[in-house]
Every structure is written in structure tokens, then in C-alpha cells.
């Protein structure tokens, strides 16, 4: 089935998920919406995030997608269940698979969750992790400066390194062996985060885990694209297309992308 996979995010963070899907499923077409004009979602109310997420989902429904990936942890926490109940296609989030991978990986059962304020407040990762192993000790840390840093495109260099180190300072005296990047923007900063937490700590990207979920769901439903299908990805941003283009083309390494401005309502 050569219909596109829909991917939505508060901004450019979901491109980390899109990249892993493209790598894992090279024949699939992705239609991506990044709500860059209203990013970040972390400080917003649950109702705002739910409304914005539904607007993106409805826009992609009109484009005849075969599956929707909510590539935003904050949006997954507040809108996944309602979308799964009401959409005519499978809807996946980014929290459960990341939690499963972390529980499998940790040896000491000491897990740090780096995420937005909204995701931390929702308790979604705590719920997912404890449902898998009640002995897991969870250290949640909101990193409100990280998403704006990525969205600005200025996430390389000493200023960015200093900002990341400052954001992770509360972990200095904590004991842990696993870190979940509980925001899809954060894998763009993964190398810098790894440099701060140290080489003995496993840093887990929910993007890679979510791409595995996508493949499994499509295979189960018999809706994988034909092996000779040529992808025709489309990207939509609610904010600046030039800034989105710069980040997307640099991150995805797919050449010149088909990117458009979109108005959601």
C-alpha cells in the first residue's frame, strides 16, 4: 500500500523520527507537518496541545495517509488515546516504545527522563516505565531551553554546548545508567548530551524505537509500500519555511526537499 505515512510534531523535532523511518523503510513516503509557528508545546496547556495535535492530524487525514505517527512526546502524552479512538488509521506515539527499550537496557534500574515541561508534568513516562518494572527509579528533568535551541538552528558550537551543560546540571549528583531522550528534538543534541553524562551512560533515542514500531505495525496490517515504490516526501511548516528547510535538509540529508507553508485550523 503506497499511501503516505503521516508524521506530526510541534516543530522540527519529529524530523528525528522521520529520518529513522526513511532509513528503516526507504520505499515509504512521509508527509510531515511541523507546527513551528506555535512551538514549543512544552509550556502550553493540555487543551492547547490537544487542539493543535488534532488540527495536524485532520490536515493529514485529508491527504489520505495510511498511518499517523505523533512524533512529539508532549502531544503523545495528551492526544494519543483520543486520536487512536477516532482516526480511521493506526496512530502511534513515541513514549511506550522508548520506555520499553529503557527498561530492557538499564542494569541499575536508574533511568533519567529528559523532556519538556509538559511531558514531565503529564507523568506519562513514569506511568509507562513503572508499568513495565515497578522497581525502576525515575529521575525526570525538564529541559525548557533545548527545544528553542534546536528550533533556532543554532544548536552547534560552544554556546549550544554551554546551554546543554547548564540544563543538565541537576543530574550532577545523581546515579543512573540510562537516559531517555523524551523529546524528539533532543536526538539532534544527542552527541552533546552524551558528552555531558559520560560514556558509561546509555542515551536512548525514542526516534529509533518509534521507527521499529512503524515497521512492525505496517507489516502486521499488510500495508508496507511496494519494494519498488519511489518515495515522494512532503513537508509542511506553520512558520518560517526557510528556517525549517535549513534544519530539515541538514538533518535528513535527502537533498532539496518539497516543503510548503500550511495554515492549521
UniProtKB/Swiss-Prot annotation:
Provides the (R)-glutamate required for cell wall biosynthesis. NCBIfam families: glut_race (TIGR00067), PRK00865.1-3 (NF002035). GO terms for biological process: cell wall organization; peptidoglycan biosynthetic process; regulation of cell shape. It catalyses: L-glutamate = D-glutamate. It comes from the Bacteria. This is Glutamate racemase. Pathway: Cell wall biogenesis; peptidoglycan biosynthesis. Belongs to the aspartate/glutamate racemases family. Its EC number is 5.1.1.3. Substrate binds at residues 9-10, 41-42, 73-74, 184-185. InterPro entries: Asp/Glu/hydantoin_racemase, Asp/Glu_race, Asp/Glu_racemase_AS_1, Asp/Glu_racemase_AS_2, Glu_race. GO terms for molecular function: glutamate racemase activity. SUPFAM superfamilies: Aspartate/glutamate racemase. Pfam families: Asp_Glu_race (PF01177). Keywords: Cell shape, Cell wall biogenesis/degradation, Isomerase, Peptidoglycan synthesis. The active site is at 72 (proton donor/acceptor), 183 (proton donor/acceptor). It is an enzyme of class 5 (isomerase).
